[in-house]
């Protein structure tokens, strides 16, 4: 298609989220305007990477322009700065889609939440969302993009906008594939036309970009009438992959800037590891642990670890290299042993990839262990951001479960704050044989649970597991440093008892045998068993989970998420406290008249109380309320009854 017979200029409205994002960018990042260059150079570098990858199987794409490079062209006379690449380019539809809409799911909710943060602005979140191209409006009041897509003939398109709610797209001319972004700089931003200003920014932010960045410079030779000004392009970056350099040559600042280039994050990473694997499988890796989670950590399009083969970019998110439970890790892997035309199918079946994956997992876990040991405060920052994701590894990565167990952090009954399992084991009481935990919705919900009464009485610390994934994590770990993990909600607490305590327990069980049998008959549709408890000291009853059963909170969670439809509800065990006044009174009433209506009423009332205590709902709230009202009425009547008259003899005695 030629310019003459192409459609005329089109005007499009920005997607609503784009308008909001532009406003956020312009008003939030005004003190960091220079980052526009890093963002645009990073995007241009991505376009070059994509072209180089396609050219492996389509070498004809390089025919009209073999060079893969970026160019910065300042024009002081026009007040413009052009960032140009010879990369993959964009078609008409891609220009409209990529520069006029946001493809992220949940984008509207994210931007609205971001806007509500006021002056705090959370720069790193804005960056993670992919400001990229729109950062140009920090320094420009008008932006023109001319692009020609590789392999789609000679059609080129011009996209233009002043960021006032709309943009235009029209036919244009461009000699070869690639994209040029021309910024019409604001009057107070002309500093970005200066050669040394541009050089310093490239050195600071983009020195490690793996393609040459050429800056157009002007030099004047001669004097007077013989003076002549010539322009030329000079390479201003090292144009070598940072991960291929020796660690001793790279500063912390360079690692941090490379991470920002790679991820578009605004904050430096918490930690990183740079390694080279030799032997049967040769590859280089550079992995980073971010400080904050991206808003779409679980989204399929989220970037993870980039795969390169012999310094050629292959793909952004190589799932085969990094397991799901390490999806927060960012970085690059560069292999010498994979073919350049590697496919997804080959990756899935490759022994090389399996070897790389194993090494990546080990290096990632080692990095977290080092962070936890050397910088515990930074590790807590990591844990609060990614702890839930890391726990998933306990259910899937058997080889790493001991190391992952050492990385867990939980609140506990001992103190505020988080504790490690190693510290917990170090504080265990004499005679304590297990690591105890309780699973529930929040610290507040579990701290006063009746299930903890016997443990607290013995001085045993209890871990509070309040994350939905914790139950699976605990089942995957099972033990730590030889100590089994035991849920306080389980039927068997593995409490050590003296012979005297065992004898007393047997006597209580025998004494309540007829009552517990009656309770089982009344509650046969609701509970598996009724038995005397050795865990209750203050509460009359509680429900415990039989072996193989799931806690009530987990059942509720699965139901809420629509995953519990086919899961049978496991009947729990009702435990009774033989020393509680309510149980003693119920036994007395039952012994006098097992068929008394009050017996069944109290049994059902106690069961409802146990359900409420564990956070479950009761089947008939109205009936429960009537029972409670009846019970309170009886108490009130007893309180209002006149005291029995004293006889003279009793009065004298008193």
UniProtKB/Swiss-Prot annotation:
HAMAP family: HSP90
Protein name, per record: Chaperone protein HtpG
Gene Ontology CC, one term: cytoplasm
The keyword tRNA processing is assigned to this record: no
Pfam families: HATPase_c_3 (PF13589), HSP90 (PF00183)
Region of interest called B, as start-end residue ranges on this chain: 345-556
Annotated SMART domains: HATPase_c (SM00387)
Entry GO MF terms: ATP binding; ATP hydrolysis activity; ATP-dependent protein folding chaperone; unfolded protein binding
NCBIfam families listed in its UniProt record: PRK05218.1
Domain of life: Bacteria
Region of interest (A), ranges: 1-344
InterPro entries: HATPase_C_sf (IPR036890), Heat_shock_protein_90_CS (IPR019805), HSP90_C (IPR037196), Hsp90_fam (IPR001404), Hsp90_N (IPR020575), Ribosomal_Su5_D2-typ_SF (IPR020568)
Region spans: C: 557-654
PANTHER family xrefs: HEAT SHOCK PROTEIN 90 FAMILY MEMBER
UniProt keyword annotation of Protease present: no
Functional note: Molecular chaperone. Has ATPase activity.
Family in the record: Belongs to the heat shock protein 90 family.
Keywords annotated in UniProt: ATP-binding, Chaperone, Cytoplasm, Nucleotide-binding, Stress response
Annotated compartments: Cytoplasm
Subunit details: Homodimer.
Organism: Myxococcus xanthus (strain DK1622)
């Amino acid at each position: 298609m030629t310019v003459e017979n192409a459609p005329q200029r089109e005007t499009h409205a920005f997607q609503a989220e784009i308008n909001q994002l532009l406003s956020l960018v312009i008003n939030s990042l005004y003190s960091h305007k220079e980052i526009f260059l890093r963002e645009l150079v990073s995007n241009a570098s991505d376009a070059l990477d994509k072209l180089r990858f396609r050219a492996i199987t389509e070498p004809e794409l390089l025919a009209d322009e073999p060079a893969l490079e970026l160019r910065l062209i300042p024009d002081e006379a026009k007040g413009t700065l052009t960032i140009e690449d010879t990369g993959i380019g964009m078609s008409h539809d891609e220009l409209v889609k990529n520069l006029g809409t946001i493809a992220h799911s949940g984008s509207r909710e994210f931007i609205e939440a971001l806007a509500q943060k006021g002056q705090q602005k959370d720069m790193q979140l804005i960056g993670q969302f992919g400001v990229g191209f729109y950062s140009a409006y920090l320094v420009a009041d008008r932006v023109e993009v001319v692009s020609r897509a590789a392999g789609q003939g000679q059609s080129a398109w011009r996209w233009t906008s002043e960021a006032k709610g709309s943009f235009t797209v029209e036919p244009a001319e461009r000699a070869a594939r690639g994209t040029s972004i021309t910024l019409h700089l604001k009057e107070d931003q002309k500093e970005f036309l200066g050669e040394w200003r541009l050089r310093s920014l490239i050195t600071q932010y983009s020195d490690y970009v793996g393609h040459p960045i050429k800056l157009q410079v002007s030099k004047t030779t001669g004097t007077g009438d013989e003076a002549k000004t010539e322009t030329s392009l000079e390479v201003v970056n090292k144009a070598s992959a940072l991960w291929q350099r020796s660690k001793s040559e790279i500063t912390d600042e360079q690692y941090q800037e490379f991470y920002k280039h790679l991820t578009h994050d605004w904050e430096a990473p918490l930690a990183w590891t740079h390694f080279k694997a030799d032997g049967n499988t040769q590859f280089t890796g550079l992995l980073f642990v971010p400080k904050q989670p991206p808003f779409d950590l679980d989204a399929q399009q989220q970037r993870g670890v980039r795969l390169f083969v012999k310094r050629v970019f292959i793909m952004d998110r190589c799932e085969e290299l990094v397991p799901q439970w390490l999806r927060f890790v960012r970085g690059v892997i560069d292999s010498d042993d994979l073919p350049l035309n590697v496919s997804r199918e080959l990756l899935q079946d490759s022994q090389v990839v399996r070897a790389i994956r194993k090494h990546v997992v080990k290096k990632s876990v080692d990095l977290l262990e080092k962070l936890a040991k050397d910088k515990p405060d930074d590790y807590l920052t990591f844990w609060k951001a990614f702890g839930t994701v890391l726990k998933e590894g306990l259910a899937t990565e058997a080889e790493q479960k001991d190391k992952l167990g050492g990385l867990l952090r939980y609140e506990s009954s001992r103190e505020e704050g988080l504790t490690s399992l190693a510290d917990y084991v170090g504080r265990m009481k004499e005679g304590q044989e297990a690591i105890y935990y309780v699973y529930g919705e929040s610290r507040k919900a579990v701290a006063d649970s009746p299930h903890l009464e016997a443990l607290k009485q013995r001085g045993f610390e209890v871990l509070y597991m309040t994350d939905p994934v914790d139950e699976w994590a605990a089942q995957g770990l099972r033990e730590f440093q030889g100590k089994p993990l035991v849920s306080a909600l389980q039927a068997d607490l593995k409490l050590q008892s003296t012979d005297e305590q065992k004898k007393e327990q047997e006597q209580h069980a025998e004494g309540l045998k007829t009552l517990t049998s009656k309770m089982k008959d009344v509650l046969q549709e609701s509970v598996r068993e009724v038995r005397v408890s050795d865990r209750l000291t203050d509460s009359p009853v509680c429900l415990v989970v039989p072996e193989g059963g799931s806690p009530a909170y987990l059942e509720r969670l699965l139901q809420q998420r629509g995953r519990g439809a086919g899961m049978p509800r496991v009947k729990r065990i009702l435990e009774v406290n033989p020393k509680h006044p309510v149980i003693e009174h119920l036994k007395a009433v039952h012994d006098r008249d097992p068929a008394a209506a009050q017996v069944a009423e109290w049994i059902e009332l106690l069961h409802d109380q146990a359900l409420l205590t564990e956070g479950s709902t009761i089947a008939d709230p109205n009936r429960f309320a009537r029972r409670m009202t009846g019970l309170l009425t009886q108490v009130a009547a007893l309180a209002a009854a006149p005291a029995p008259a004293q006889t003279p003899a009793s009065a004298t005695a008193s």
